[in-house]
Amino acid sequence: MTSSTPPSASPPPPGTTASPAPVRLKPLRSLTARGKGETHRVASPLELFFDLCFVVAIAQAGIQLVHAVAESHAGEGILNYAMVFFAIWWAWMNFTWFASAYDNDDVLYRIVTLVQIAGVLVLAAGISRAFEDHEFVAVWLGYAIMRFALSWQWLRVAWSAEGAERTMALRYAAGVLICQIGWLGLLILPEDGRAWLFLVMAPLEMCVPIYAEKDHPTSWHPHHIAERYGLFTIIVLGETIAAATVAVKSGIDENDALGELLPIAVGGLLIVFAAWWIYFVVPIHGHLRSNRQAFLWGYGHYVVFASAAAIGAGLEVAVEQAVGEAHISTLAASAAVTLPTALYLLAVWILHARHFKVGLAQQLVLPVAALLVICSTFLGEWAVLAAGLVSALAVATGTTLTARLVARESRESPGQASSAVM
């Protein structure tokens, strides 16, 4: 890349339109804030590549959760999953919000982002040992690589900024590094102390942005943030479908168990389809108007992403139990699907849907659906199919209620569209 003026070119042939000359920028530029009202802001190819690499780590966490639950170690597996998933999600979230405010796409920014990607791949490589041997060296190292890279980005911001913005950037850089030192407890403390360390360090990590931005908020872009979260949700749901598909295929190929697996396959597909529908039924960027709203919404997505990925792990467990490879009961296997599904429905309702619903009937659709999904746990081999049908029925009910409301408002106020949603 260079900043020189390109040589003049011959005029285009008659009847054709000349392509615009590429914009030539310096390879190294100041890392300054982007405009919050910037038009046509969309996710960059680097951000999409970043997401795809992070899903590799999520897939590894899901695989280990399947093994733990299938071997009757659900409690230990869920705890390890929560800890590892927090590391993945928190590193992804910090990068996402930083990029929304400061992405200048210069050479150094790209290199540091690629270092963060390398970090999550190191973390992913250590997930199996964290679950099986309770050894967190690779997980800590991968997380440290990502956090040191992020701290460097904030120091670049501080170098270019002044006043309150510079103070904010320095607070971020220092907070990230201090928390990383705290996570050394994963390598030092006995196994019984790691859960307590997590309960202390996770809230401390989440306090860093709140403290850093108390005097000067970053200029994150609402539409860009909503798109980034939406794209990551799609990728996680895609990984859920991929994992469940592989499990069903293996069950059919190795055990010729199509009859036993068909209800799980159909129910799982309905659950994932409904999960996509209720998340994207209405754009959320209009709700993100302040840091307070953004923090609650962004932090709440830990539950959305973790439960969405856990649905795929649960479907794998249900398949293994159906073909006799899991050492758990049908009830436990069913709960592995229904509980994360219900949690996802509730989380999306709290973070998204309730802000746009009109009337008690609309507000109750997703909470009631979550309750019915939990009740379907007790339906034996039909539990997953029942949960899928309930999820699909929730979508249909919400859509019907919205259509009726729109029709009524159209009669009362012609020309005005309703904002109510499923």
What is each of the regions a protein language model found here?
Residues 1-11:
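N-terminal acidic, proline/glycine-rich, low-complexity intrinsically disordered segments
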Residues 192-197, 380-391:
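Loop-to-transmembrane alpha-helix initiation sites
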Residues 52-67, 376-377:
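Alpha-helical transmembrane segments of multi-pass membrane proteins
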Residues 15-49, 53, 81-111, 118-130, ...:
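Predominantly late transmembrane helices and immediately cytosolic-facing juxtamembrane segments
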Residues 62-77, 100, 129:
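Short, hydrophobic transmembrane alpha-helix segments
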